[in-house]
Amino acid sequence: MAAKAAALSSSPFVSSRRLSSPAASLRARTPRCVMGSEQVRVVVEEEGKTKKRMGVAEPRSAPPAVWTPRAPAQEARLAALRTDGRDSRLKIFSGTANRPLAQEIASYLGVDLGKVLIKRFADGEIYVQLQESVRGCDVFLVQPTCSPVNENLMELFVMIDACRRASARSITVVIPYFGYARADRKAQGREAITAKLSANLLTEAGSDRVIVCDIHSTQALGYFDIPVDHIHGQPVILDYLASKTISKDLVVVSPDVGGVVRARAFAKKLSDAPLAIVDKRRQGHNMSEVMHLIGDVKGKVAIMVDDMIDTAGTITSAAALLKQEGAEAVYACSTHAVFSPPAIERLSGGIFEEVIVTNSILLPEHKCFPQLTVLSMANLVAETIWHVHRDGSVSSIFQ
């Protein structure tokens, strides 16, 4: 790990701060937030007139950096992908939810991002037309179903149908963040299981395969009647942490009992670090209460691991408890930055040394703050797509 850290420390995107100095005061720095270099154009047709509406924030003259791992072995694999990736049967299209990620994935594979026209009519209906042939092609549709969830999900359904009617050989939906994944069971009577419904609708629309990243509950993978490849964002976060000088006094913390398996796997890969658990009781939707700590964090650097950060109530309450129990510094690591209000206020309040997320969800500028670091998962998704396209093993990517 030391050799890897030395090799990666020269990257201009790597923070100069070290985990071995947790007591250092929080310094203001430019947030490493994802912003698209290209805008997603959504056309609204109203009374015969065409108006333009931008689906993402305006790009800035100097977009903040997104840290991408540069391990030599990984670079060799990606070089092979770029060399062999000029396969006319491989087509990658993007919806409006996260075009910058889709563009980066296509660039890694050495292919052009597919041309597609996506329009919104005056009454809100969605129109999709593919601008190139997909007959006999393996089509991959990149679309996280993040906020606005229903809008992005419906747009994905329409894109799937357009590809199916255009005689695509296979249709794989790439969903970096799977909305409704938390509605995976009936907690009370007369409730819907929306995760299962979403899986059914994706199948009925015409999907042949699904690629998802760090779905909230792995049992939801069984809701699909088609093949599902479940990939993990942990390697991206672990590579970033490996680029820093890791303190020996390190502890991985699960912010709730439900995330223990995830945190234990993370701790094992992080030099077999000790594990601590925050026990809490949830009082209602988007509300939680931290009860007590299981484990020792006194004088240690705490790395909190979760699959997503929504309102940040759970993770900030847990971080406050860790501070009370004597943790020198607290880092938050999560694959999905949902960031529903009041998450930004909670996360930027100074309790976290750093908040580390991936670009599975496109973050607008108003959701960026000084402690935020965004890591790119494009290379991980690109390798997965290539293995699926070539009928290779996806699990081998994570070994």
From Swiss-Prot:
Lineage: superkingdom: Eukaryota
CDD domains (UniProt xref): PRTases_typeI
BP GO terms, sorted: 5-phosphoribose 1-diphosphate biosynthetic process; purine nucleotide biosynthetic process; ribonucleoside monophosphate biosynthetic process
UniProt keyword annotations, A-Z: ATP-binding, Chloroplast, Kinase, Magnesium, Metal-binding, Nucleotide biosynthesis, Nucleotide-binding, Plastid, Transferase, Transit peptide
Keyword Plastid: yes
Main location: plastid
Residues reported in the UniProt entry to bind Mg(2+): D214, H216, D225, D229
Co-factor requirement: Mg(2+)
GO-annotated cellular components: chloroplast; cytoplasm; ribose phosphate diphosphokinase complex
Molecular functions (GO terms): ATP binding; kinase activity; magnesium ion binding; ribose phosphate diphosphokinase activity
Cofactor note as given: Binds 1 Mg(2+) ion per subunit.
Ranges for region Binding of phosphoribosylpyrophosphate: 299-314
Presequence boundaries: 1-32
Compartments in which it is found: Plastid, Chloroplast
Name assigned to this protein: Ribose-phosphate pyrophosphokinase 2, chloroplastic
Organism for this UniProt entry: Oryza sativa subsp. japonica
